[in-house]
């Protein structure tokens, strides 16, 4: 037999698909700067209306050239916003809630895939009906009313619409 050539063995293994992939998670000695904050406001308005909004900011910086093999996996959009308007008693026993969520594009890094997650705006809504005789509330609603499928990470499937009905007894 003679000496083995690890380089040739590696090339042969890659060419034939005879490999097992794995991810080794490590830290890094390079300087990493991160900053984040969130702020939310809510205001009751006349006639039982309420508006609310929140904003989240997340920033993560480091010099990739100082450690090219380091994969941060921060996986968070820099900007996220949510706003809603609601009224739990718009008229006798009826209420509603409509909200909009937005996030900008961001880089997704993981052991199985790296790539950009697109900017997305999603609108959700629900109506509610109070049933005083049963001390209950019936809610009917939907998420992602626009119907455009979107993703929040790489790997799993796309997120579509979801419809729901709930009955809360003795709220």
Question: Which ranges hold each PLM region?
Answer:
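Conserved C-terminal beta-signal and adjacent last beta-strands/turns
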Residues: 50, 56, 72-171
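Gram-negative outer-membrane beta-barrel transporters
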Residues: 3-107
């Amino acid at each position: 037999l003679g000496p083995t050539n690890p380089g040739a063995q590696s090339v042969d293994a890659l060419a034939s698909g005879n490999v097992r992939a794995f991810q080794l998670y490590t830290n890094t000695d390079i300087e990493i700067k991160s900053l984040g904050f969130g702020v939310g406001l809510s205001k009751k308005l006349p006639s039982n209306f309420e508006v609310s909004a929140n904003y989240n900011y997340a920033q993560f910086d480091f010099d990739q050239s100082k450690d090219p093999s380091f994969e941060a996996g921060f996986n968070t959009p820099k900007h996220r916003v949510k706003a809603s308007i609601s009224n739990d008693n718009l008229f006798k026993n009826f209420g509603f809630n409509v909200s909009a969520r937005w996030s900008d594009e961001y880089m997704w890094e993981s052991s199985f895939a790296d790539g950009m997650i697109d900017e997305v705006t999603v609108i959700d809504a629900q109506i509610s009906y109070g049933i005083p005789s049963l001390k209950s509330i019936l809610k009917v609603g939907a998420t992602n009313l626009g119907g455009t499928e979107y993703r929040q990470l790489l790997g799993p499937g796309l997120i579509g619409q979801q419809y729901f009905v709930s009955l809360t007894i003795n709220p």
